[in-house]
């Protein structure tokens, strides 16, 4: 029987995951099916259990179920534990569920794909919500000298405390006095046409700026960063493809090439398909 995978969410019709994983499977010569499943808001656990019982081998999880997926798992990766959320479910040989969070790995992979060095670089992570939590451990593993900025400073401090063995600094965005090597906007501010609170001093002509949001046009954050002379501005489409590639690897132990998939999705975005 062909191995079955799926993505669970609500809403889910917009998901690019089936298209992405179909391209990954074709490129790597893997035989599998991957579908989008609309889970009821009050029936996520039941939907996943039914899918796995019917032969499902693994799944992705998107909003609003990542925290519920966390509680559903029998074991968790370090990334998932720090994130407090799961976006990848792996059915183990004994039927138990292992949860992982590949969002941060996708972010780091995309930065590396753009030639961005993270080791010993001053990295500002803007925001302290779920997206920031998912990025925290992979950025620390990559050797970043991490600073967290958030509108509510206590949330940034709580996030920094999740990595007690590493010196993660916390700062108010309006108090930044010198430029960072890399700035990562993990907030969803760009979706509403807003900017996070960051002093213009944070950016100079050597700063790489990354917005986890993406669209057919440059995000508001990236437009602002470019106007201040940022060296490179990158949106989050590559992070989407990167996290999918990491999920695919966890399931199949074959690492797909993200670049051609990213190019296809970018062209679709621009053309409005």
Swiss-Prot record:
Coiled-coil ranges from the UniProt annotation: none
Binding positions for NADP(+) per the UniProt entry: 78, 127-131, 150-155, 212, 236
Pathway(s) this gene product operates in, as recorded in its UniProt entry: Metabolic intermediate biosynthesis; chorismate biosynthesis; chorismate from D-erythrose 4-phosphate and phosphoenolpyruvate: step 4/7
Gene Ontology MF, one: NADP binding
Lineage: superkingdom: Bacteria
Bridged cysteine pairs (disulfide): none
EC category name: oxidoreductase
Residues at the active site: 66 (proton acceptor)
EC number: 1.1.1.25
Alphabetical UniProt keywords: Amino-acid biosynthesis, Aromatic amino acid biosynthesis, NADP, Oxidoreductase
Catalytic activity: shikimate + NADP(+) = 3-dehydroshikimate + NADPH + H(+)
Gene3D superfamilies for this protein: Leucine Dehydrogenase, chain A, domain 1 (3.40.50.10860), NAD(P)-binding Rossmann-like Domain (3.40.50.720)
Residues that bind shikimate: 15-17, 62, 87, 103, 214
Family note: Belongs to the shikimate dehydrogenase family.
Subunit description: Homodimer.
Protein name, as recorded: Shikimate dehydrogenase (NADP(+))
């Amino acid at each position: 029987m062909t191995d079955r995978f799926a993505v669970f969410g609500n809403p889910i019709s917009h998901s690019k995951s089936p298209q992405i994983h179909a391209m990954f499977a074709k490129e790597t010569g893997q035989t599998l099916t991957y579908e989008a499943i609309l889970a009821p808001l009050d029936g996520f656990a039941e939907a996943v259990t039914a899918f796995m019982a019917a032969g499902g081998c693994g799944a992705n999880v998107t909003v609003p179920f990542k925290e519920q997926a966390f509680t559903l798992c029998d074991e968790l990766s370090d990334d998932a534990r720090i994130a407090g959320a799961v976006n990848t479910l792996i059915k183990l040989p004994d039927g138990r569920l292992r949860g992982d969070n590949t969002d941060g790995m996708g972010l780091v992979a995309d930065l590396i794909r753009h030639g961005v060095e993270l080791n010993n670089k001053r990295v500002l992570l803007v925001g302290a919500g779920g997206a920031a939590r998912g990025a925290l451990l992979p950025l620390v593993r990559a050797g970043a000298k991490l600073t967290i900025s958030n509108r509510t400073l206590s949330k940034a401090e709580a996030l920094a405390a999740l990595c007690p063995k590493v010196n993660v600094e916390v700062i108010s965005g309006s108090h930044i006095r010198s430029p960072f090597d890399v700035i990562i906007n993990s907030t969803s501010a760009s979706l509403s046409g807003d900017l996070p609170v960051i002093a213009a001093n944070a950016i100079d002509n050597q700063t790489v700026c990354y917005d986890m949001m993406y669209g057919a046009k440059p995000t508001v954050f990236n437009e602002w960063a470019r106007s201040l002379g940022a060296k490179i501005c990158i949106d989050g489409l590559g992070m989407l493809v990167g996290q999918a590639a990491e999920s695919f690897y966890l399931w199949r132990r074959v690492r797909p090439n993200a670049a051609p998939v990213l190019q296809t999705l970018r062209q679709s975005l621009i053309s409005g398909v």
